[in-house]
Swiss-Prot record:
GO terms for biological process: regulation of developmental process. The gene is gdt7. It is found in: Secreted. Residues 1-22 form the signal peptide. One of its GO terms (cellular component) is extracellular region. Keywords: Secreted, Signal. This is Growth-differentiation transition protein 7. Belongs to the GDT family.
Length: 801
């Protein structure tokens, strides 16, 4: 009895397993198409795409694939190990789970043609020829490794004979690679991307030295040594022949067949060299490419996969045009969700880029090249993924070099070259919602959400190098119902990266950095930009958000445009006139920062709410920055003070060289309520001015000008070292406000008065913040100031800290 029950339970479990995980996932389609497999996306995708079908559908090409003999000792590919293998035809093979197999590419010369490779176990490709296939699918848990190139083909390619009459792929994934969870690693053994400098019109010096390419001894198979040169004028590159010196460091260039050979220009700021190996050469190929240009291929990675690409040229891939999307539509039966009754083939599939990566947090791209010669959207698209990309070349004809969509928390980009041939102005006329969230308008890196760390990258030809665009409603194309703007702080680190917006893209405004929330007022975000160095404009449209720049280096031509709720500039140097006059803010904080001004006639910032801290250190000569720096100023925050008080105002400087003397440095103090006062810098490198507050209420706009006074009898600010506007000092005569004082005697009155002024004990607590009035934050600067109160104030007090 118990045995019978157990058998029934086991059969029930088996039935449920097959019902839930096998049959239900197979979607039947109309005649002429592959059936489809429904692949459940990870939860993060459904989080961003909540209202529409979030499942992924791919053709059921693995069902009838040949499986190897069930012998564990078989670990190398041979046709005899796959029953039914057709030596003269197109074969699909399946590597089962817990099986590992090595495929050596000389089999390509032995009438072995692979059509589909399905990998649930491990499939390793070695050799010195291309892996020749139409489709590679890495199933969940599978592992694909290759140390040679991959050549995709389809029925449209010449030389592909007796192609079988196969069903159509409605999803548009193939020819190409589809990784559904597992790992993929494709690694070339030699570097293919090199930096170069010009020697003369036909010679360049590259780094590191290029290895000699072996030339076939067979004259019928002889291939010229070719390289492809990329510059600002030729962002898509041009082919030429080359010869090297003994160490492979100096390349002498010459024309190749009908390809023109333009001389290397003296004006080229960037020269990149791509060493491409093809299938006729006897060296190991380093391309992943579609064989001919009639149709393209793509690589689509999802499902939490691990991806590693090194020294690989992605060629003739990517077919998502820089036009409005037109995806394939599946018409499901109203009675059965596993039956598709009709398929409307799309003309512009989303995310069929050279490389599209989704829901994968461990992606590394190193020393690779991506070149898309057609008007495509982008070679690289990332969704909900973390990516490291370095020492690579990304060249596009249009669109953006990289598109980073929702959930991409981190992009680490270092020493890459991002080249764009032109901004496709035609795409600007297309309805905005069909394009703007997908980077159609000429960007280096177009980002919806990630933190970006860029170090030593070079951008050329774009309208905007870094473009953050947050859209309140972007469900039109990416199926995301909610705003792409999140409330988490976003950090952008841009260090030693350069931007060259070439003149070929017309008179459009060009920005090194653009951050735009598109009027989104529902969520506030705090942006941090670190180490940015540029001589180009940046633009911000952050109506309800704040942005802070740390260690900003703004060269000549730098400026800020747009509007932002709060702007912080901290520890920065801006070497351009009027660089921040065109930015509209509610609150501005400029702290420990130096701003160039050719004239000493500097207008202070106006229309700032109390709480803004604007203390730029203006300078007129960049040499001053190498000699002196401002160590501290007091007061260093806005203060409110009682008329009749006396306190010291100070500036402390620091020399940056032992040869610099402070003997002739003077400080000229001016304000609306005191006479001009000259104070010599003392032995402590400080200027101290005792300031007696008059009875006149209102703002006391205090300025100090540091001058190199070589003639003490004639002090002038014409050739100033630094000009500093102190934070706002507000003088009150008769006013009732919270004092910020606490009484030593707890029994003392809660309100004190002197000279007609009334003060309430303590401070006003608003949202855990201590304020001395309804619109001004309590400032700890008082504890740093030496203040003498009016003589009629007798009560013993101490400052709150």
């Amino acid at each position: 009895m118990i045995k019978t029950i157990l058998i029934k339970l086991i059969l029930l479990v088996i039935f449920c397993y097959h019902f839930l995980f096998a049959e239900e996932d197979v979607i039947s389609t109309p005649p002429g198409y592959y059936d489809l497999i429904r692949h459940k996306r990870d939860p993060p995708i459904t989080e961003y795409q909540s209202s529409q079908d979030t499942d992924l559908y791919y053709p059921d090409v693995c069902r009838n694939a040949l499986r190897p003999l069930d012998y564990p000792w078989i670990n190398e590919f041979a046709p005899i190990f796959f029953p039914g293998f057709n030596m003269g035809g197109f074969n699909s093979i399946f590597i089962p789970k817990n099986r590992s197999m090595i495929f050596r590419t000389p089999f390509q010369d032995s009438l072995v043609t692979l059509h589909v490779v399905c990998i649930e176990g491990t499939f390793i490709v070695e050799g010195n020829r291309f892996l020749f296939a139409n489709t590679i699918i890495v199933l969940p848990g599978g592992r694909f490794e290759s140390t040679t190139g991959i050549e995709f083909y389809d029925e449209n390619d010449s030389g592909v004979s007796f192609y079988p009459d196969l069903p159509k792929d409605p999803s548009g994934f193939f020819p190409g690679i589809l990784v559904l969870g597992g790992s993929i690693s494709v690694v070339g053994k030699e570097p293919i991307v090199y930096r170069a400098s010009r020697i003369n019109d036909s010679s360049i010096e590259i780094s590191p030295p290029v290895p000699e390419i072996i030339i076939s001894p067979n004259p019928w198979d002889r291939v010229y040594k070719l390289v492809k040169i990329f510059t600002e004028l030729y962002p898509l590159g041009f082919y030429c022949r080359y010869n090297t010196d003994e160490v492979g460091k100096i390349l002498s260039l010459s024309s190749y067949l009908l390809y023109p050979f333009p001389p290397v220009s003296e004006n080229d700021k960037i020269i990149r060299v791509l060493v491409e190996t093809d299938r006729q050469q006897t060296v190991i190929p380093t391309n992943i490419y579609k064989r001919e240009y009639a149709t393209k291929g793509s690589i689509y990675i999802t499902g939490g996969s691990n991806a590693y690409f090194k020294n690989i040229f992605f060629k003739n891939l990517g077919f998502t045009k820089n036009e409005p999307y037109n995806d394939t539509k599946l018409i499901f039966s109203p009675n059965d969700t596993n039956v598709v009754t009709d398929i409307i083939m799309g003309t512009n599939q989303k995310f069929r880029s050279s490389l599209y990566i989704e829901s994968s947090k461990n992606v590394t791209i190193e020393g690779c090249a991506f070149v898309e010669n057609d008007l495509t959207r982008s070679p690289l698209v990332f969704f909900d993924s973390n990516v490291k990309i370095s020492n690579s070349l990304i060249s596009s004809k249009s669109g953006s070099n990289i598109i980073a969509l929702h959930g991409t928390d981190s992009i680490q980009s270092s020493n890459n070259s991002y080249l764009l041939e032109k901004i496709d102005l035609a795409s600007w006329d297309v309805e905005r919602n069909n394009n703007i969230d997908c980077g159609n308008q000429g960007n280096g890196i177009f980002s919806i959400s990630p933190n970006i760390n860029s170090n030593g990258d070079y951008f050329s030809g774009q309208q905007t190098a870094f473009n953050y665009y947050f859209i309140p409603n972007n469900s039109v194309n990416s199926n995301q119902d909610n705003s792409s703007l999140n409330s988490r702080p976003i950090e952008i680190i841009i260090k030693d990266s350069m931007f060259n917006p070439t003149a070929s893209n017309g008179s459009l405004n060009k920005y090194f950095l653009n951050i735009n929330t598109d009027g989104n007022k529902t969520i506030s975000t705090y942006f941090t930009v670190r180490d940015l160095k540029t001589s180009h404009a940046i633009n911000m449209n952050l109506n309800n958000s704040a942005i802070a720049f740390y260690n900003l280096k703004g060269g000549e031509g730098f400026k800020m445009e747009g509007n932002v709720e709060r702007l912080d500039i901290i520890g920065s140097i801006i070497n351009s006139n009027g660089s921040i006059k065109n930015i509209s803010t509610s609150t501005t904080n400029i702290i420990d920062s130096y701003i160039y001004s050719s004239s000493s006639d500097i207008q202070p910032f106006n229309n700032q709410i109390y709480g803004s801290l604007i203390t730029p250190y203006y300078y007129s000569d960049s040499n001053t920055l190498d000699k002196f720096e401002i160590k501290s100023i007091l007061p260093n925050a806005p203060i409110q003070i009682v008329s009749g008080s006396l306190f010291n105002v100070s500036v402390q400087i620091q020399t940056l060289s032992s040869s610099v003397s402070i003997d002739n440095i003077s400080c000229i103090f001016t304000s609306s309520v005191i006479n001009t006062t000259v104070v010599q810098v003392n032995s402590n490198y400080s200027c101290i001015l005792p300031l007696n507050i008059t009875n006149e209420e209102g703002p006391l706009n205090l300025r100090v000008t540091l001058v190199n006074n070589t003639s003490p009898s004639s002090v002038s600010s014409d050739n100033y070292l630094y000009i500093i506007d102190f934070p706002e000092i507000t003088v009150f005569n008769t006013y009732e406000f919270y004092s910020g004082w606490l009484m030593d005697n707890s029994n003392s009155s809660q309100q004190i008065s002197f000279g007609g002024n009334s003060f309430k004990n303590g401070c006003n607590k608003v949202d855990s913040n201590c304020t001395i009035s309804q619109n001004s934050k309590y400032s700890t600067v008082f504890s740093q100031l030496s203040i003498t109160l009016p003589s009629n104030f007798k009560t013993k007090t101490h400052w709150m800290k």
